[in-house]
């Protein structure tokens, strides 16, 4: 489960930000997770709750925004929606599709007090 190490990385970023801003606690963390990122939102929620126990982020709400997958189809020469990383183009059926979006995971927002 790589979500545990990802949650630990998010916590490190959150703690660094909270420390830099002299915050007393973290109220909310917003993550953007691409549908093609191989990150399971429910697993990251579980892991985030586990790794934040005893930290400045304990009890913080975790909001996840799903980023749709997109890719460039070399046959169609256009951007197409993607639902799986190595899937076929929904327009022409070609497998020559290069992902262009939805593979990322990033911290979009941290609310502190």
UniProtKB/Swiss-Prot annotation:
The keyword Metal-binding applies. The keyword Ribosomal protein does not apply. Keywords: Metal-binding, Nickel, Zinc. One of its GO terms (biological process) is protein modification process. Ni(2+) binds at residue 2. GO terms for molecular function: nickel cation binding; zinc ion binding. It comes from the Bacteria. Zn(2+) binds at residues 73, 76, 89, 92. Belongs to the HypA/HybF family. Involved in the maturation of [NiFe] hydrogenases. Required for nickel insertion into the metal center of the hydrogenase. This is Hydrogenase maturation factor HypA. It comes from Dechloromonas aromatica (strain RCB).
């Amino acid at each position: 489960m790589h979500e545990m190490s990802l949650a630990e990385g998010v916590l490190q970023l959150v703690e660094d930000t909270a420390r830099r801003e002299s915050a007393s606690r973290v109220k909310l963390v917003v993550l953007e997770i691409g549908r093609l990122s191989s990150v399971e939102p429910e697993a990251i929620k579980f892991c985030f709750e586990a790794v934040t126990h005893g930290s400045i982020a304990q009890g913080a709400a975790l909001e996840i925004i799903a980023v749709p997958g997109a890719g460039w189809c070399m046959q169609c020469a256009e951007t197409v929606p993607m639902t799986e990383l190595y899937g076929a183009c929904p327009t022409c059926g070609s497998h020559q599709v290069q992902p262009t979006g939805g593979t990322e995971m990033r911290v979009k927002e941290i609310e502190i007090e």
